[in-house]
Amino acid sequence: MVGIVIVSHSRKAAEGIFELAAQMAGEGHKMVAAGGMDDGSIGTDAIRILQGIQEANDGDGVVILADLGSGVMSSEAAIDLLEEDIEVVIADAPILEGAVGAAVQASVGGNLAEVVAGAEQAWNLSQRE
């Protein structure tokens, strides 16, 4: 199963997004919330993200969803730190809607490209239609 790492500057935001996406995905998901700093402050930590990638990895790849630009930079740093051969993609998607789309695709057995597409299709959602 493709793993998912949710990267937010806020631990609470990452955990809330995780909770919602996990509810949509159902049992057996491989998602990790990697938000905030160890001291509870706002920020992103490449080591925490690296650990999230390793935890979420099941051999089928990992998709990262990040909230802001420096979350993407920390995610890129985490990927650079990987010693294992894990295929990791940072999805270009809004973090909440993208996490839900990715989680649903992963839960039905989607491959890495399908899970990334599930996340990135969130740009096409309209709340008014």
Q: What is the predicted role of each segment?
A:
Residues 1-129:
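N-terminal loops that bind phosphate or other acidic moieties
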